Amino acid sequence: MAPTAVFSNPATNPVANLKASVKTAEGVPATLNDLLLQATEMYPSHELSFITSSAHDSSVQARTFQDFNQRVRNLASALAAWKKPAGEVVVVYLTEHEDNMSAVWACLLAGLVPCLQPALSAQQEHKEGHIAHIRKLFGSATWLTNDAGAMQLDTIKGLDVHLFSDLLASAEKSSVAANYVARQSQPDDEAILFLTSGSTGFSKAVVHTHRTIINACIAKGANYRLTPQTNILNWVGFDHVAGSLEMHIAPLLYGCSQLHVHASAILSDPLLLLRLIDERSIDIAFAPNFLLAKMVRDLEKRTDLHGKFDLSSLRRMNSGGEAVVSKTAVAFVQLLKKLGRNPSKVSFKVAAGFGMTETCAGCIYDVVDLAENSPKHEFLALGAPVHGCEMRIVDPEDGATPRSDGQPGELQVRGPMIFVRYYNNPEATKSSFVEGGWYRTGDIGIIENGNMRLSGRIKDTVIVHGVSYGIPELETYLQTVQGVTHSFLAAAPYRAPGQETEGFVVFYAPTFDLQGDDASKKLSETHRAIKDVSVKMMTLPPQHIVPIPMDQMEKTTLGKLSRARLLSQFVQGALAKHVARAEELISMARGASFVTPSTDDEKALAAIYAGIFNLQSNEVSARDNFFELGGTSIDVIRLKREGEAHFGLSEIPIIQILKNPIVSDLAKYVNGLVNNDASANEYDPIVPLQLSGDKTPIFFVHPGVGEVLIFVNLAKYFQNERPFYAFRARGFEPGHPFFGSMDEMVTSYANAMKKTQPKGPYAIAGYSYGGVVAFEVAKRLESMGEEVKFVGLINIPPHIADRMHEIDWTGGMLNLAYFLSLVTKQDATDLHPKLKTMTKEEQLEVVWKLAPPERVTELQLTPGKLDHWVSIAGSLIECGKSYNPGGNVSAVDVFYAIPLKGSKEDWLNKQLKPWSQFSRGEPQFIDVPGQHYTLMDFDHVPQFQKIFRGRLEARGL
C-alpha cells in the first residue's frame, strides 16, 4: 500500500534553539507585550531602521530597540486616554512602516486590538461597501490614520477617525515607564487582526492571538536560523502578515536588527535592494517571482554593474506570494554572482515558501542552493513544514480521505501557528476546518517524499504579479457580454508552461450557432469584448477563450459549471476541437476584412510587422494597426529602426509611427519622406494612440519632456471603449520652432482638440507639467461655450513657476535622463553638483557614458538628439516660468503619487490641495500607486488605468 501524503517536521525543538540563540533566562515570552520588553532589555542598542516613501535619496532613519520601546509605550499611554473598552478593534490605516509598527504596538500595550487595513479601493462604491462591512463586523468604527487616509474617509459618515499625528503629539507630552502597559494581556487574547484580500467577496478578519503569533515566530526563527547578529531587510507592507509577523516580530523575538523599506522604493529601483544588501550586510531578504523576473530582465545586460556589489552577507532569499518559476530563480542566482564583487563568496539559498494570512505567513519552505542543485520541476518546490506544522493531501471532494504519496489533492495544514477563527464569522470559520483541526487552504498540492509542491487552486482567484483578482467578479461582468449565454460561462486560473505569472482561461457557450454563416463575425466580436473586459478588470486578457456549444457544457446537480472539470478537459486536450473551431472562425473573420498589401512600401512594412509579431508576411493586412496587433513602446523603436534601414532613411520620427500605426497609412507617410513631400513634415500636436470605442475621447497632455511615449501602454486599456489622443510638444521635427509661451501652446492644443472633436463634452488630462496645460486648455474650451466634464491633473500643483525657476539646464537635463532611464535616480541626484561646473557638452558626455547601451539603442538616441531634446524640455520650462494660475473649471480630479521631494502627506496638503480654489465643483484627490516618474510604467499602469477609468465613469463619461 502506498504511503499517504501526510508530513510533519521532526526537527529539533525550536524553543530550545531560541533559548540558546538569545541566551535568555526568562524563557519564551507568553505575550507580545512580554516579547517587546524582553527584546528591549536584552538588545537595547539593536536597531529598527526605515526608508520611507518620501526618502528620495534612500536615506535611512534608525531607532534603537530602547528608543522604539519608549516611543510606543508613550503612544499606548496616549491611546489609553481615549477610554476605549478593552479588546475594542482599532482599524490602523497608515502608509509608512514605522507608523504602522508604532500604532500596532501601541494598541497592543493599550489593550486594544489593531486591525491592519490595506490600501482602500479608489472605486467609491467598493470603498463604501468595504467600510460598512468592517464597521458591522467589528461593531465599532474607530480608525487611526494619516491626513491622506482621513481624506479618503471624509465622505463616509459615522466613523470615529483619529489622526496618527495627533496621537504622536499627545504622546510627546509624557514619558511613561519602560515597562508600561495600560492593560495586561493573556496568551489567548486576540492580538492582531488581518484582513483577507476580499477577492471572492468582502474581506474576512483573521484573528491571531498572542499564542499563535509567538508560536509562528519561534518556528520561523528556527527555520531561518535567526540570531541576534542577523540583519533583516523587508519591503513588504506592514498590513501583510509577511511584513509584520515574518519580517518584524519574528526577528524581534531573536534580537535581529531590521531595515524596513517602503515598497515603492524597491519596486521603482530594484538596484536599491542590492545596494542595501551591500551597505547594510543583509542576511535575509524577500523577493517574489515577479521581482526576481524584473531584476533578471532589467539587469542581465548591465555588464557595467558586474562586480559592483558586496553580496557576501546574503544567505537566504525568501520568495512567496505566487509560484516561483525555476528558470527565473536560477537566472537570479547567476545574476547576483555576476554582480557580486567576489562571485565565489556569493552563496545564498532561495527559500520558496507557502503561507497564508491564516497561517501567520510562511509555514512551509524549501531552502535550496540553486547554484548547486538544479530544480526538477518548472516551478520551485515548496518543501516541508516548519517545526510544529503538519501538512497533508486529501481528496478535495470530502476534505478528509488521504491521498497517496505523489497524488494531487487538497492541501491542508494544522499546527499552533494556524489562526483561531474569523472575527465574528462562525460560519466561515467552521467551513475552513475539518475534523482533527486541519485547515483547508483551498490549494491543490502534491507531496512526494515529504516535499510539497502546488499544482493548482480550488479557490476562485488569479494571482497576477502577486496581486489577487477575483474570478467570480470577472465572471459576473463577462456574463453581460453580447454573444455569451447567461450562466454558461466560467473562468479558471491557468499558467501556461514557461509563463512567469498566472493567467486564466474563459469557457463559454455562445448564443449563436458556431456552424452558422455569420459565426465568424459574431465570435470575433464576442472574443474582442471578452478580452476588453478582462484587461480592464484583471490587467491582462485571457490566455485562451474556448467557445463550447451549450449542450456540451455540463452543470453540476446544483446547476453550476465546474471550473476544475473544464480546466482539466482543456489541459488534457478534450476541448481541442472547440479550440480549433474558434481559431478557424477568427481566421475567417480576419480574412473577410483582410486587405492585401499592394504597394512595395506596404509589402515592406507588412514584412516588418510580421517579424515583430512572429507572423507570416501574408498574415498582415494593409489595414492592420500596429498597436492592435500588440505593439508596445519598445516595439515602436524596433519598427522605426528596421523601417529606416529598409527605406534608407536617416529618420522616421517616432511621432509619425504613433500617428500612422496602420500599415497603409505608414506606407503613405514613408513614401512622402522618400519623395521629399513637404506635407509630411507639417506640425500636428495630436497623436492618436488608439481610435476604437464610442465613449467620449480622452486627450492627454505630455509631461515636461514633451514626448508621449509614456502614454502608449496606458492607451491600450481604452481599446473599444474610447479614443485616446495625446498632445506632443512642438520642436521635435526639423523646421518646427519651440513654443514661445504658455498661451501659444494652449491655443495650439485647444484648436487641435476642437478640430479632432468638434463638440463636447470634453475630457482632458495632463501628466506632471502637462497638468497645468490641460487645466488651461479646459478653461479655453469653456470660454468657447463648450462643456468640459473631466479635467485630470496628475501629480502636479497649480503653482509651478517657482519650481520652473529652480530647474537649471543641468537639472533639466538630468530629469530628462532619469525619465528616459539613461541614469538612475541616485545618479541624477548625485551628479547635479558635480556637473554644474562643466560645459554643456561635457555634461552630456558624462550622461552619455553612463547610459545603458541597450537603452540608447532602443531610443535611437545620439548625443545630438539628446541635446536637442534637452532644449525642447528647456523651452517648456521657460513657458512655465511666468505661469500664474487663475480662473476655474467645472471640476478637477487630482491624482497624486509619491512626489520628487518631501512626504506624500505634505505634497497633498500643501501643494495639491490649492487646486480646490480653481474648481467650481467638488474636487477629488485620488491616491495612485508608484512614484512621480513610475506611476505609468509597466508595473504601475495596470492599477493606474483602473483608478483613472473609474474617475471618468464617476464624472459621467
UniProtKB/Swiss-Prot annotation:
<feature type="region of interest" description="Thiolation and peptide carrier (T) domain">
    <location>
        <begin position="601"/>
        <end position="671"/>
    </location>
</feature>
<dbReference type="InterPro" id="IPR020845">
    <property type="entry name" value="AMP-binding_CS"/>
</dbReference>
<dbReference type="InterPro" id="IPR009081">
    <property type="entry name" value="PP-bd_ACP"/>
</dbReference>
<dbReference type="InterPro" id="IPR001031">
    <property type="entry name" value="Thioesterase"/>
</dbReference>
<dbReference type="InterPro" id="IPR036736">
    <property type="entry name" value="ACP-like_sf"/>
</dbReference>
<comment type="pathway">
    <text>Secondary metabolite biosynthesis.</text>
</comment>
<dbReference type="Pfam" id="PF00501">
    <property type="entry name" value="AMP-binding"/>
</dbReference>
<dbReference type="Pfam" id="PF00550">
    <property type="entry name" value="PP-binding"/>
</dbReference>
<dbReference type="GO" id="GO:0031957">
    <property type="term" value="F:very long-chain fatty acid-CoA ligase activity"/>
</dbReference>
<protein>
    <recommendedName>
        <fullName>Atromentin synthetase</fullName>
        <ecNumber>2.3.1.-</ecNumber>
    </recommendedName>
</protein>
<dbReference type="Pfam" id="PF00975">
    <property type="entry name" value="Thioesterase"/>
</dbReference>
<dbReference type="InterPro" id="IPR042099">
    <property type="entry name" value="ANL_N_sf"/>
</dbReference>
<dbReference type="InterPro" id="IPR029058">
    <property type="entry name" value="AB_hydrolase_fold"/>
</dbReference>
<feature type="region of interest" description="Thioesterase (TE) domain">
    <location>
        <begin position="697"/>
        <end position="947"/>
    </location>
</feature>
<keyword id="KW-0808">Transferase</keyword>
<dbReference type="GO" id="GO:0016740">
    <property type="term" value="F:transferase activity"/>
</dbReference>
<feature type="region of interest" description="Adenylation (A) domain">
    <location>
        <begin position="59"/>
        <end position="464"/>
    </location>
</feature>
<keyword id="KW-0596">Phosphopantetheine</keyword>
<keyword id="KW-0597">Phosphoprotein</keyword>
<comment type="function">
    <text>The L-tyrosine:2-oxoglutarate aminotransferase atrD and the atromentin synthetase atrA catalyze consecutive steps to turn over L-tyrosine into atromentin, which represents the generic precursor molecule for the entire terphenylquinone and pulvinic acid family of pigments, which are widely distributed secondary metabolites in homobasidiomycetes. The first step is catalyzed by atrD which converts L-tyrosine in to 4-hydroxyphenylpyruvate (4-HPP).</text>
</comment>
<dbReference type="InterPro" id="IPR000873">
    <property type="entry name" value="AMP-dep_synth/lig_dom"/>
</dbReference>
<comment type="similarity">
    <text>Belongs to the ATP-dependent AMP-binding enzyme family.</text>
</comment>
<dbReference type="GO" id="GO:0006633">
    <property type="term" value="P:fatty acid biosynthetic process"/>
</dbReference>
<feature type="domain" description="Carrier">
    <location>
        <begin position="596"/>
        <end position="674"/>
    </location>
</feature>
<dbReference type="InterPro" id="IPR045851">
    <property type="entry name" value="AMP-bd_C_sf"/>
</dbReference>
<dbReference type="InterPro" id="IPR020802">
    <property type="entry name" value="PKS_thioesterase"/>
</dbReference>
<feature type="modified residue" description="O-(pantetheine 4'-phosphoryl)serine">
    <location>
        <position position="633"/>
    </location>
</feature>
